[in-house]
Curated annotation (Swiss-Prot):
Keywords: ATP-binding, Kinase, Nucleotide-binding, Serine/threonine-protein kinase, Transferase. Residues 30-50 are annotated as: Disordered. It comes from Phytophthora infestans. The lineage of its organism: Eukaryota, Sar, Stramenopiles, Oomycota, Peronosporales. SMART domains: S_TKc (SM00220). InterPro entries: Kinase-like_dom_sf, Prot_kinase_dom, Protein_kinase_ATP_BS, Ser/Thr_kinase_AS. This is Serine/threonine-protein kinase PKZ1. Interacts with BZP1. It holds the Pfam family Pkinase. Its EC number is 2.7.11.1.
């Protein structure tokens, strides 16, 4: 149905020394991320028409809720679109590429003064083949700025900076060193209940924060949940953080390109991934906070079993999955669920209710008995092998 994509993200063993040593060994020099637009005339600079990305940057600025640091960044980005403007230099150095997608690439960045390592998404300002990516970037910038202005959340990826250099936009966010939740499941199999609960609790808390402020993520899936730390013990689900810049949270909700207020008659091209859309979106285009809870139910099902609830072998066509989502109940009738607690199954069933008005909210999910069960009761059983190891891939969304 949906094919596997990029490999696991590169592990960064230290903040400064290892990156600089790596560059020295390659005989390379770090590229300075600086605002250095040139004042001399050139054919491109003479064009006064704004690119779609310019409008996206200004749109994000218009949606700003007054965060001083990021408002200044947007203002500088807007000014950078005008030829002949000198702007303040930004102190981020760029290193290895760690990801790629339709929008462009993601590279490691290091702040010259603090030594913080971050993820830097680099998007070309003018790419006729990717016009649809500009509204998505506008939504992402606006959503991350809103979250930051509201005080942020420990389980939502934090916006560090946004600026334009030359004809590229740079979106700097905190780095999650453990890679995607999806990659963890593929590599190590399903999670023990204790660790799955930790992830579910943090995601429910993040969604509760967003929903209270009228923001719907609209694309919750394992690929968009990032692990803050790398795995140390695959069987017990132990993780390790080793850096003062790293968050105390286990996971981070990322990729806000679909985020926005609740909507009706939603264009399916603007939101989500097919395998994680609830019945109401498929039937009428209605996308509310309940959509995020359905998707989180799918994620929890995958964490505990290694399979998608409506595509158990990972090979079904989109049309078949859509039919199952609309018409068939979730099932736990295969061996991966033999040792999973009844409370866990009950929670998933209440998240995957077809009627969105009956579906658990994020706050209700946090009060469910399974979310508050004792660690001893949940720790029974080790990780089970992923179905991927037996040639049964779980669905993956597009990059």
């Amino acid at each position: 149905m949906l094919r596997l994509g990029r490999s696991a993200a590169s592990e960064v063993s230290s903040i400064r020394n290892s990156l600089q040593l790596q560059l020295e060994q390659r005989g390379a020099r770090p590229m300075q991320c600086a605002y250095q637009t040139q004042s001399h005339s050139n054919p491109e600079g003479a064009k006064r028409g704004r690119s779609p990305m310019s409008l996206a940057v200004m749109g994000a600025a218009a949606l700003s809720v007054g965060l001083e640091l990021q408002t200044d960044g947007i203002a500088q980005a807007r000014a950078a679109m005008e030829p002949g403007t000198q702007l303040q230099r930004h102190k981020w150095q760029l290193f290895d590429q760690i990801g790629a997608g339709a929008f462009g690439v993601v590279r490691l960045g290091m702040h010259e003064e603090s030594g913080e390592v971050a993820a830097v998404k680099i998007v070309p300002l003018e790419n006729p083949n990717d016009q649809r990516s500009y509204p998505a970037l506008e939504r992402e910038i606006a959503a991350l700025k809103l979250v930051k202005a509201l005080g942020g959340h420990n389980s939502i990826v934090d916006l560090r900076d946004v600026y334009v250099e030359g004809r590229k936009l740079f979106l700097v966010t905190e780095l999650a060193r453990g890679g995607e939740l999806f990659e963890q499941i593929v590599a190590y199999g399903s999670f023990p209940e204790l660790k799955a609960r930790d992830v579910a609790r943090e995601m429910a808390s993040a969604l509760s924060f967003m929903h209270r402020h009228g923001l719907v993520h609209k694309d919750v899936k394992p690929e968009n949940i990032l692990m803050s730390a790398r795995v140390v013990d695959h069987n017990s689900g132990v993780y390790r953080k080793s850096n003062r810049h790293e968050s105390s949270s286990l996971v981070k909700l990322a990729d806000f390109g679909s985020a926005g207020p609740a909507s009706v008659n939603t264009n399916l091209e603007d939101i989500g991934t097919a395998a994680y859309l609830p019945p109401e979106v498929l039937n009428s285009g209605m996308c509310t906070s309940a959509c995020d809870m359905w998707a989180l139910g799918c994620v929890l099902y995958i964490m505990l079993s290694g399979s998608h609830p409506f595509d158990l072998d990972g090979m079904s066509a989109d049309s078949v999955v859509e039919h199952r989502v609309k018409s068939e109940p979730v099932t736990f009738d295969f061996s991966a669920w033999d040792n999973v607690s009844p409370h866990a199954k009950d929670l998933i069933s209440k998240l995957l209710v077809k009627d969105p008005t009956l579906r658990l909210t994020a706050d209700q999910m946090l009060q469910h008995p399974w979310m508050n069960a004792s660690a001893e009761a949940a720790a029974a059983g080790l990780r089970r092998p992923s179905p991927l190891l037996a040639g049964q891939p779980i669905p993956r969304g597009p990059a």
